[in-house]
Amino acid sequence: MQGTENTAALLGRIAMSLLFIHGGWGKLLAPAATQAMLAGHHLPMVEYGWMLAVVVELGGGLAILLGLFTRSVGLVLAIWCVATALIGHTNFADRNQEIHFLKNMAMTGGFLYVAAFGGGAWSLDARWLRRGVSRR
């Protein structure tokens, strides 16, 4: 059963990371469009918001993919999913926004699971732990 759990953890990390890597990469390549979207939500300091979004989404997505600092990054991405749902997807009269809100809540649950249980045996975290490498 251990092989099944390891495979599921790896496939889960891959699936969960794709949305964030894709979104973060898009934001990195289109800063003006991202900043305009943030301004449309009446957020202050959109230049910093753009940088934060790129770091959290692209950096966090890559970290989850690799299983690096998985528990901490999982918690950060769970909070990010709730924040972006509350900021950008609360127009429940629009069915599309309702679906995006629920998608964010589902991702929140997945990231909380990652935060609780880690990235599995096939992660950089586990590899470093096996080798006794300190990540401080």
Residue ranges and their predicted role:
Residues M1-L29, E47-V55, G59, L65-R136:
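Extended, low-polarity transmembrane helix blocks
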Residues L29-P44:
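Membrane-interface interhelical connector segments
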